[in-house]
A protein has these predicted regions:
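Beta-strand->loop->alpha-helix junctions that form or flank phosphate-binding loops
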Residues: 74, 198-199, 213-233, 252-258, ...
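Short functional linear segments
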Residues: 1-46, 53-66, 71, 107-114
């Protein structure tokens, strides 16, 4: 099997959609020899910030000299970036080789009466198999959707569970209240385990604490009160903070927005907890500093161009939109802002627009390359409630070119 054939096989599993449950992934992994059982996993769930926290944790551990797997989704540029070891994407040849093996196992499953695995189940199985082959020391594992019945939650043990910011998203699948969504996220907490928790609403905290009580797990709420931000602009942020009674001065991150400072502190808390577990022999402050500053997470308030400044961000729910709006307000207040936007129909479009659009003078709508995308003309009609200067361009390339052609060097896109 060639790499292109492997991708085609994976894409065919798309037709099985999203199916939450652990029976299928469990059988597939059993046929692969249960590779996940060999791994030391930091398991991260939540609505916003999962990938950033996983990336911070992964980079700090690498700076400590460990071999670290990083599993995230979706991908931004190339499929192989979903499965990384020490910053390197899984090689295409390994994708082809492992998918060929997985295909054989799936045929056995189906003959035994099991359903075809979904795309996410197939890719998750491949990740576990690859990390086990690579004999990684740790895996920073990002939940795909929810937690309780997510394919990543087939693991029976983790070093620590982490729950980042929780807000309303995927309400059709996870539930339409913070309490219901928090319950799904808290599903990653293990019996007698430990969970590190981002600052949450009281409703979310109560649910997570209740799950911890039921599972005899330890609940640790990360404190974000003692933070002194010394510098914050579109290029980097410098801050002092105290994490688990240890003070750090002049930490620097390249990720933008106050929420990313909180995400970095959550990552430091994970590292310090692992040290307390005697899982880290060679952790030091310099490793933490280097890991933080070397963390890049594309598509999160990321500046990709100057003159005009061009920023890309993946905000697609209310909390994500608030974080983006806050960062724009802080860095570009009073400047002329242009928004190029495309969204999926199943997102909370109205809430996102209501939060973001007061910051923009001009808007270009486009249609993402996704079967769930909202048509750019329909999106334009929604935007017109807030902004007068709105243009619809169906093709993304046309939309980008039009945006650049109609902007001056002083504009912010």
């Amino acid at each position: 099997m060639k790499y292109e054939e492997a991708l085609e096989y994976i894409s065919q599993t798309n037709k099985f959609g999203i199916r939450l449950g652990l029976e299928n992934i469990g059988k597939l992994l059993e046929l692969l020899g249960n590779p996940q059982e060999t791994l030391n996993i930091i398991h991260v769930a939540g609505t916003n910030g999962k990938g950033s926290v996983c990336s911070f944790v992964s980079n700090i551990l690498r700076e400590c000299g460990y071999k670290v797997g990083l599993y995230t989704s979706p991908y931004l540029e190339t499929f192989t970036e979903r499965i990384r070891v020490n910053g390197q994407n899984i090689p295409q040849d390994d994708v082809a080789r492992i998918i060929e093996l997985i295909k054989e196992k799936i045929e056995i499953m189906v003959k035994e009466g099991y359903a075809y695995p979904t795309e996410f189940e197939v890719v998750t199985a491949m990740a576990f198999y690859y990390y086990s082959e690579q004999k990684v020391d740790f895996v920073a594992l990002e939940v795909g959707l929810g937690g309780r019945y997510d394919a990543t939650n087939i693991i029976t043990k983790s070093l620590v569970s982490v729950i980042v910011s929780i807000s309303l998203d995927h309400t059709g699948i996870l539930g339409d209240t913070i309490e219901k969504i928090a319950y799904e996220k808290a599903g990653i907490i293990k019996e007698n385990g430990v969970v590190l928790v981002y600052d949450q609403t009281d409703e979310a905290k109560d649910v997570i604490k209740s799950v911890c009580k039921e599972k005899k797990a330890k609940y640790i709420e990360v404190d974000f009160d003692d933070i002194n931000i010394k510098k914050s602009d579109i290029n980097s942020q410098i801050y002092d903070c105290t994490v688990m009674k240890e003070t750090y001065r002049d930490l620097e991150i390249k990720l933008i927005g106050e929420h990313q400072i909180n995400n970095s502190i959550l990552a430091i808390s994970v590292i310090k907890y692992l040290k307390d577990l005697n899982k880290l022999a060679n952790i030091n402050e310099e490793s933490i500093r280097k890991g933080l500053i070397n963390t890049k997470w594309p598509g999160r308030i990321e500046k990709i161009k100057e003159n005009p400044i061009f920023i890309i961000d993946g905000a697609h729910n209310e909390d994500g939109a608030k974080s983006l709006a806050k960062a724009l307000d802080k860095n570009f207040k009073g400047r002329k802002l242009t928004l190029l936007i495309g969204m999926l129909e199943d997102k909370d479009i109205d809430s996102v627009l209501e939060i973001l659009l007061p910051h923009f003078n001009k808007v270009i709508t486009t249609t993402p390359n996704n079967p769930r995308a909202i048509n750019s003309d329909i999106l334009r009609e929604k935007v017109l409630k807030y902004v007068d200067d709105v243009t619809s361009k169906h093709e993304i390339e046309d939309a980008v070119n039009y945006t650049l052609e109609t902007s001056s060097e002083d504009d912010i896109i």
